[in-house]
Every structure is written in C-alpha cells, then in structure tokens.
Amino acid sequence: MFVRVGMVVALVAATLCGSPVQSVRLLDHAALLGDVPDQAWYEENIPFVDVPDTAIRDTYYYRWRTFKEALKYTGPADGWIVSEFLGPVGYSAPYGGIDAAAGHHLYEGRWLHDQRYLDDYLDYWLTGSGSGPKPATEDLNRNTTDWAHQYSFWAVDAAVARAEVSGDWRFLTDRLPALRKQYEGWKATNFDAAKGLYWQTPVWDAMEFTASSYQSDDPYHGGDGYRPTINAYQYGDARALALLERKAGDGSAAARYDGEATKLRTATEKALWDGSFYKHVTRAGQKIADREEIGFIPWYFHLPPASDAVAWQQLTDPQGFSASYGPTTTERRSPWFMHDALAGCCRWDGPSWPFATSQTLAALANQLLDYPAQSYASADDYTNLLHTYAVTQRKGGQPYVAEAHHPDEDRWIYDSAGHSEDYNHSTYVDLVLSGLLGIRPQANDTVRIAPLAPAAWSRFAVENVAYHGHDLAVYWDRDGTAYGKGVGFRVLVDGVEKVRRATPGDVTVAMPPAVVVARPELVDDAANVGETGYPTASASYTWHGDSAANAIDGQDFHLDVPSTRWTSYGSPHSSDWLAVDFGAATMVSDVRVDFYDDGGGVRTPDAFALQMMDPDGTWRDVPGQTRDPAAPWRRTVSRILVDPPVTTDRLRIVASRNDGGAVGITALQSWRQPDPRVSVSFVEPSLAVDPGRAVTVHTRVTGTTAAATLSVPRGWTFRAIAANTWQVTVPADADPSAGLPIRALVRTPRGVNSALLPTSYQFDPADYPTVVWNDDFTTDRLASYRVDHPAAEPSPRLAVSGGVLTASADSRAFAVLAAPVSGTAVVVSPASFSGAAPEDSLFLGLSGGDHDNAMVWYNNHFGTSGADVQTSGASHPEATGGCCAAVKWTPGDRFAVLSRWGKLTTWIEHDGSWTLLHTAPVTAAVPPATLASWSPAVGLRLDSGTLSVDRFTVLAQ
C-alpha cells in the first residue's frame, strides 16, 4: 500500500528515514546489475554481493529481478502481494496470490530494505483477501475453506524469519491472533489427534504426482499421508509462535506452543523416520520404501536430532539424489524415478524442482551451521549444490527459471510459454545471503556471521544489507587487492568495523538496538489489477499483442513473454497516447511512467507530455510539473511531481520519438499519500443507479474535522443535503452498467484520503412495465414464432401442453423461437432440464435469422453462462464478454437478458433477488440499429431427453 521506493522514490523524507544509509560502498553496483530496468529500485532495496563464482553471482542478481517482477500492487485494501506466476491462473486466491510458495516469498523478500512489500503481503494472507473464504472443491482443496490453507504453508516460521532480519517484532506481536489462527487452522482440517501427526495430500503440498501418490488409487489427487512437509511446517510454526508469545510477554502460551512442538517432533521421529530417512507414511500406517527429497525438509526447521545426520549421505549418493542439474525429487534407486516425468507436468518423482532445491539447501545450511560436526555432508557440498542450482537456472545461456528441469540434461521440462517464465516458486537470494555468506539472522540484538564459502576463495563481499534497521557489510579479501581496503575478513555495522580476522570464521556481532521507522502508506489511484470496473485505460493505438490495461495492472516488468505492457508498435501516428480514466476525479500529485524499450521496434520516447482532461473535454498539459529525470531515459522510471496537486478524472501520456517510431509503457501510476490518522468511507457498500433518477449517499469521516468532498462521473451532478449526506443525480443518457464510481476525498495538511463507492445497475422487471409478449404456454402459440437455426442442427420436437413448452430429442438438436415483437428485456422461466451432456442449454436474447443473433446462454450440465454473437454466420468473440460465469439453476429460478447501452446483460433470479451473471458488449460487432431490428427469442439446445420452459416474456419501458 505504498509506492515502490526506487520507482524512483515517493517523498524524499520518507526514503531517508525508511532504510539505513549505506555507509560503505566498495562494489560497483551498476556493473553488477547490468542492463536491468529501474536500477534505482535495486540501489534502494537489495544487498549487493560479489563472489568469485560468476554463475552464483549472476544468478543472484537475476533472482532479485524475478522477485521484483513478482511484486504486484493490488489496490488500497491489500496493497502489495508477491505473485507466483507473472500471469493469472484459475486456481489462485484474489489478485493471483498462491500460498504454496508464500513461505519462500517471505524468506526471499526478508532482505528487502522496504518493509512495506512484505508487511502488505503478510497481512494479505493473515487478515486480507488471501485469508478469505475458498470453495472446498476437489480442484481447490476440498479439505480446507480459506485461501491461506489451500496449500501447505509455513506462515508463522517465515514471518518470524523475516522479523529476525528487520528487527520489527511489534509488527508480528500485533498480529498474534491472526498468526495463531493460521497455525490452528491446520489442526481443524489435517490433524490426526490419535497419532499426533498432520496428514496432507501431496497435491496440496504443491506436488501433483509423486512417488507417494502413484502408490495410491488416485495418482493426481490421492496419496493422503503423514508427510515430512506439513509436520515440519507445523513444528516450525509452533516454535515460532512460542518465540512470539515470549516476545509478547505470555510465558504460559509460549510453553504451550513449545510443548506442542515437542510432541509433534517426537511423533514425527517415531512415525516418519526409518533409521536413515524421513518418509511419507500412508493414512493406513504404511511407510513407503522410496526416499523423496521432502525427507530433508525437517532440517529446514531444526526438527531432527543430531543423530539423524546420516540422511544427508543420500544427497550426494549417485543412486540417491545426486544429479548434474539436481538434486532429484525422488531417489534414483526408486522404481518410480522419473515415472511419466516427460509425459507432461507435474511429476515430482525425479525432475529437479527449484521449490524443493531451495528447501534442501536451506536445510543443509542448518545442518552444517547449527548442528554438531558430522561426516555425511560438508560446506563444499553446500557450495557445489548452490553452484549446480545456479547453472540449472539457465536457458539458451541466459539466466532463467521455470517450473522443473531435467535432472541430467540441460533443459527445462516444465516450461510453458506465457506461463512458466521467471517462475517465482523458490528461493535463491536467501540461500546466498544466509547460507553461502553465512548471515544468520537472530531474534536478539546480534547477528551471526558464519560463511559456508569455500576456503579456496580469495574474496567475497556483501554490502548494503539492511539488518535491524542498520547497515551491515561483510568483506573477505585475502591479499587486499580485491576491494582495496585491507587484508582479511571484516564485518562492519553502520560503517564501523566490528570484526577483523585473518580468515573468515563463525562470529557473533553485537548490534545496536533495532531501528524501525514506518514509511508512509501510498496509494496508486491508477491501478486496476483485476481489469474490472475503474480505473480504465485506453490508447490512441495498441499493437494487437499488447493492451492498454497492462499499463495499470499493478505489475511492472520488461519481458517479451509474458508481458505487462502497452505499445504503439505498428501505429500510423507520429505520436501516441495512453490514458487513464479514474471514473471520478481524484487528486494527482505524483505520477510515475515506466517506458518500455526492447532495443528494436519499441524505444524510449524522446519526449512526452503529461496531460489532464478539463471538464469541457479538452486535454491540456498538467501545470506545475517537476520531472526526474528531466527527459526520458532508457530503462529509467520517469517521475513527475505536480505542485500544487491537480484534481482530475483523466490523465494521459502523449509520447513521441524523433524518428516517428513506436513507444511503450509497462507502468503508469498515480500515487497519493493518505493521512494515517484519517479514515473516510461510504456508509453504503455499493449503490444501484438508474438513468434519470436521484439517489442518496452517505459518507463517514473520522480522525479529522475536515469535511469530505464528493467527485462524481462526468455528466452526473450532486448536492449536499446534510452533513455527510449527498444527493446524486444520474443523467438520463448515462450507462449505469458501466460501473462508474463515486469518490469521497478528505484533504488534510498530512495527506489526501479517498474512498470509492462502486455503482451498478440492478435489473428489476418492474422497471419495464410494458409487457409486449407473454407466453405462459397455456395455449399453443408455436405457429406465431419464427424458428431459427443458429447451428446446422435439426430442431428438437417442440410441444406445448399443460402450461409448458417442451423440446425433446434423441440426439443433438437446437431451435430458436423468435417472437413477432420488439422489446428491451426477455425473461424466461425454465421448468426442467434434460440432464444430458454436454448440451443441456437454454438460450435467450435477440435473433435476426439463422445466421444473425446475439444470444446469452445457460448450460445446465457445466453450470456456466455466457453469450454467443454472430452476423452473417460469422462468430464475434470480441462481442461476447468472454467465458464464462459459474451459476447453477434450481427450480423456481428465472433468467433474463437485457438489451441496453449497447450490451446484453444476463441475470438470474433466485429467491426473489436478481443477480448479474454476464455482460456482453454486443455492439462491438452489431450496429445498434441492426440489433434493434432483431426479434426477442428463446432457444433450446440438448443432446437427448427433454428440456422445458413454462414462461417466455418480453418487456419494454
């Protein structure tokens, strides 16, 4: 809920107090970063590392780039989240959150200077949209009912690991109730009290097909068992909760969680340890013979006793997990090794999986640094495996991470175009910092430095580490030639040398008390991650592979595929514009533009204008601009401060190149700083509006004596009728289905607060009092209809009897009955469906004959609703509104379609209430006059059996 500090920075004062000033700089940051976009962000946010192993080093900076790409701003409610995929998937929580790798995200992101990214992200899972209700379905985990428990998730442990770096324990102790709830949630769904163990289905460990699940009757969603994963996760979370309870002063609660952890550790050791490895145990109590890489996870949480170290000999065993691009996810000696692994995703029975490699390396670092010495694994094993992991992350010689890699061949095997690129499902940065370079964060005012780097290395360095709010740096320079600041191993805090040794070693350094300074919340009023409602984006010209909406989707990265950009590639214009419509006016003071430059057909503009639209519809340059940089610069974000701020409902960037070539934008943002003391909201959660009518809205303001002002969409009017009470009038020619918002603004010397009230149209048949056709099928009027055939399919047998129209068929049949009238709304009451598959569908809408129609549909078999539009027999998907809305008809429900404002809107009535299902922008393909000439119609399509309706009504205003 803040602006990305390196994009360039919002409010200079906020930047200075928000992160420690780097006191030592011996590394060439620009050279290390290379040609990465938005270098200022990295300077403000990441530790800089130098090591002799260039594969490890280059992958380190690449993985910071992929992490930055995964940062997604969702809006003022949830702020920032960390995404797994760069594009959306159908099984995610709101805005694309997936908790499977959220623990990895928290460990990786804990090294960021700006804490607000992970503050928001933790709140998203603990109390925000990520903690919200989830369908308990087979596809989304039938055992759990909220998104934060969709997949196994070591939430509390990761939150504490992050606080060990930031030093901000108050943030977590303030959230103890939510953290307890997250931990306890697994007890309610996945705990076997009789055995004292947690069970999980491998797929909900993010492991679809495994050696475990293949030994069940359902290799994909089967294989329930007591697994090293969730039991170790819950052990780690219990220990973390105990620490937090002690921080909060509740020793009794701490002892309770410590006790639960001890019992779980004992039960896990007894049931899952076979004397040499931790294994999956079926619900029936059978320990599988196969070793899986998940058997190393207990060390990630310090669960095993020292005597279990023998397991680590499997990591380097050629018949165990060793591989050229490993480790493997199942031991080679298993008969399930690589079973079907090359047949398609997602087989975790041998492929090299970054998710698991991350856990194994973190676990190995713990074994090496936090347990007694043993003979099964060494620091060299750690460095060798980290190097292997680094070189695995390559494609075509360039840094790259996807979903899974072949263990023995230099190729990614689960790597779908537009889906798997820069897959954020693992850690790497944390493994370099906390393992290789040995920065071991602590819960007290110390830091432990215990590098695992090879003794043969003559140098390594890390600087610009934000640790407990201080600047931490570590340098090793054997002969003093690498960094020019002397010989030996040094640790510096805030520029002061705290340790100097002849060689690297395991040292604990006292730290000054942690410094936690909150940075101000900032809100991007231009962001619309869901691409529904407002704000909206438009452009003078858009290349067919891009989208104006991409520039305001809350993401900012410069990949070719997938993309989050708008470009004017192919435009005939000498300059092009990208505009944002806020729906209702807001204050504009801080605009950021990230221009896209692919080094080819799309380049950084030579000049651009920032313009606002006046009330009369004319565009003019925004006054009072100060730009940084003064002119556009390749791969550098342009920041425009506007002083004094302006209030407008529309902004645009007009960009041009001297050679007339194409331009592009990956992010257009308008940041606003709220006053943290103030709250403004609407009493109404939403507002139904209708053209030509007035409605009343109420605002609520707390924390200030300042009054709210109202902003309404263009053409709408309002007047105050009492304190915090407003009458809003919608013009007669307005489109209420557009979802335009009403905005309340409160201005104080410390910021501007805003609240949005979405408006919508609510269908009510009573608003269409003229009944132009009403067939209740008490008499046979079939001869009055025109029968159309939108598809080359025969008509079903049609009959009217007993107040019901029945369509019967033995095979696929389809007919549309067009009424001899015109109207605005069509209402149909189904009586029954056939139960056939896949076609068991009702259609309603407008028909102009066999080859011309705009019909919405409900498919009873699939429980979905959508629209079809065709003219002259040609389909027009651009006019259908996409597919599909999920809905299930029950007896007594009615369907309606409304043809107004150039759209077909589909509605269902259930228990007397009408709900919008779908919107089709039909006039994108059918001219309004043509649409008006078509006839209201009802269609019936089925594969067999009978489908019936008991009323067909056409209404007009």
Locate each region found by the language model.
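Ligand-recognition surfaces built from glycine- and aromatic
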Residues: A924-Q957
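Acidic/polar, glycine-enriched structural segments that form the non-catalytic walls/loops
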Residues: P20-Y95, E164, W169-F171, L176-A188, ...
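Non-catalytic carbohydrate-binding regions of carbohydrate-active enzymes
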Residues: A248-T282, V310-G469
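Aromatic, loop-rich ligand-recognition surfaces of beta-strand-rich domains
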Residues: D560-D621, T636-R677
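Short, aromatic/His-centered strand-loop micro-motif at the edge of beta-sheets
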Residues: T871-A896
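Extended glycan-interaction surfaces of carbohydrate-active proteins
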Residues: R57-P94, L112-T145, A188-Y226, T266-S352, ...
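Secretory/extracellular carbohydrate-interaction modules
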Residues: A807-G866
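Aromatic-rich carbohydrate-recognition surfaces in CAZymes
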Residues: D35, Y95-M207, R227-Y235, I288, ...
